[in-house]
Amino acid sequence: MLKNILLATVTSVFLLLSVAIHAEPISVVFTCELKDGKTKEDAMAVNAKWLKWARATGGSDEITSSFVSTVIGDMGSFMWVDTYPDITTWGKIADGDSGLDAEFDAVSTCSGNRMYRGEQTVPAK
């Protein structure tokens, strides 16, 4: 009996920890370059369609997407920074097909992407 209670307790703790991990916001960052003759506005027009699709598919208006441009440094590249309320919402997007790949490919070339989970620093007391 004690063994069953201990097993149930340990299982519950792991389940609670996994829920906490899944509830944390994540960001996906794509490093890209605009194609010749294309503008930030061209890229953002395609991305606006994607964001509408992503929010409907993910079931969350908390999904955001930003065009991040260089202020100092290599001016030829930009980043898409997509933020999701949790990994589960991102998974719905990753499993889906927006049908916009060709439109994105027409305006930009992306060389890589990374997924990040940030942890906010609390100021010292």
Report the location of each language-model feature.
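Bacterial N-terminal signal peptides that target proteins for export
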Residues: 1-10
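Glycine-rich beta-strand-turn "strand-cap" elements at beta-sheet edges
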Residues: 6, 22-27, 61-79, 100-125
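N-terminal signal peptide c-region/cleavage motif recognized by signal peptidases
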Residues: 18-20
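Short N-terminal segments immediately surrounding and downstream of signal-peptide cleavage
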Residues: 23-41
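Solvent-exposed beta-strand motifs enriched in subsets of small alpha/beta binding domains
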Residues: 31-32, 80-82
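Short amphipathic alpha-helical segments
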Residues: 38-64, 98-102
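Short amphipathic alpha-helices within nucleic acid-binding modules
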Residues: 40-42, 85-96
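Mature extracytoplasmic domains of secretory-pathway proteins
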Residues: 52-55, 75-77, 89-92
